[in-house]
A protein has these predicted regions:
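A beta-strand edge to alpha-helix "cap/lid" segment located at domain peripheries
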Residues: 3, 53-136
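Hydrophobic alpha-helical core bundles mediating ligand binding, dimerization, or RNAP-core interactions
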Residues: 8-15, 31, 51, 55-59, ...
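Short acidic-aromatic low-complexity motifs
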Residues: 1-34
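A solvent-exposed, acidic/Ser-Thr-rich amphipathic alpha-helical stretch
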Residues: 21-76
């Protein structure tokens, strides 16, 4: 990720820890004042303040304590991509992809996608090689 190594290391450290509470501190320390987090699938956008409040209160408000399992982070220049899975307490490994945009050494925007596992349709069997689905 170019000269953003310190930022990349901190993001990776927090994500590997899997603690959503740590994400509030990460947003506080390593995001721009005008940071936004967008979830295109549900049509939601959060400001920096809302991201921190939600991360801090997630277990109380949602009734679950999600666990993030880090897979990898790739990037270069001012863009990075994070891949992992999230277990919201029901054992379902929700696939996660986050695209981060960096400005002045801090995260300015995160666009995040969440996908539940699904069975592959039978008609694709002749075209694909089977692999293990994501696990938490």
């Amino acid at each position: 990720m170019g000269d953003n190594r310190e930022l990349a290391a901190k993001v990776e450290e927090v994500l590997k820890g899997g603690d959503f509470g740590g994400m509030a501190q990460l947003a506080r320390d390593y995001s721009t004042d005008d940071f936004v987090e967008e979830w295109p699938q549900s049509g939601e956008r959060l400001t920096k303040a809302a991201t921190m409040r939600m991360a801090e209160s997630y277990p109380q408000m949602s009734g679950t304590t999600p666990k993030f399992t880090y897979k990898r982070m790739l990037g270069g220049g001012d863009v990075f991509v994070v891949e992992g899975t999230i277990d919201y307490g029901d054992g379902v490994p929700v696939s996660y992809v986050g695209i981060g945009e960096i400005r002045d050494g801090k995260v300015a925007k995160m666009t995040e996608y969440f996908a539940n596992p699904f069975e592959a349709p039978a008609w694709r069997a002749d075209f694909v090689e089977r692999m293990e689905p994501a696990r938490v």
